[in-house]
Amino acid sequence: MTINPDDDNIEILTGAAGGADTEGEGEGEGKSLTDLVEQPAKVMRIGTMIKQLLEEVRAAPLDDASRNRLREIHQTSIRELEDGLAPELREELERLTLPFTDDNVPSDAELRIAQAQLVGWLEGLFHGIQTALFAQQMAARAQLEQMRQGALPPGIQVPGAQRGGATHPGTGQYL
């Protein structure tokens, strides 16, 4: 995996055994969850901001002006999130988030519910990404181990690897 701190591009290399990290719900037609998040760093930043904002909103009472501002932040955050997601996840996010109307000020409870819903969706997305990355790492590790074992002549074993759980001392001459 290559991460460039100057931009949101993260390259994820997958092995030949890459079927383990696809979503089972038919979304993306075989795409992995990591492929559905086009700008992971941006999504993580916005998710962290939204979570922090929700904690702040819980702690303080809101007047009309702050509720209007929070509504604007919520709508802007969703638009920005959509820019970092593949169309499949964009559609899911649109189905789950209800837009606020411009003619009335949302109540504290409405704002808290909307923010909590968005935080919950993002946390589910992050857990899915972590699971997919873990599955990729395990598949790559298994593939590397298989390549190592296949590259050695018969009877030779990788140092540190044990046969049958027993340790056998070396039988050669020591110089």
UniProtKB/Swiss-Prot annotation:
GO terms for molecular function: proteasome binding. GO terms for cellular component: proteasome complex. Keywords: Proteasome. A motif (HbYX motif) lies at residues 173-175. Pfam families: BPA. InterPro entries: Proteasome_act (IPR019695). Residues 152-175 are annotated as: Disordered. One of its GO terms (biological process) is regulation of proteasomal protein catabolic process. Interacts with the core proteasome alpha-subunit (PrcA) through its C-terminal hydrophobic-tyrosine-X motif (HbYX motif). Interaction of Bpa with the proteasome stimulates proteasomal peptidase and casein degradation activity, which suggests Bpa could play a role in the removal of non-native or damaged proteins by influencing the conformation of the proteasome complex upon interaction. Belongs to the Bpa family. Forms a homooligomeric, either hexameric or heptameric, ring-like structure which stacks co-axially with the proteasomal alpha-rings. This is Bacterial proteasome activator.
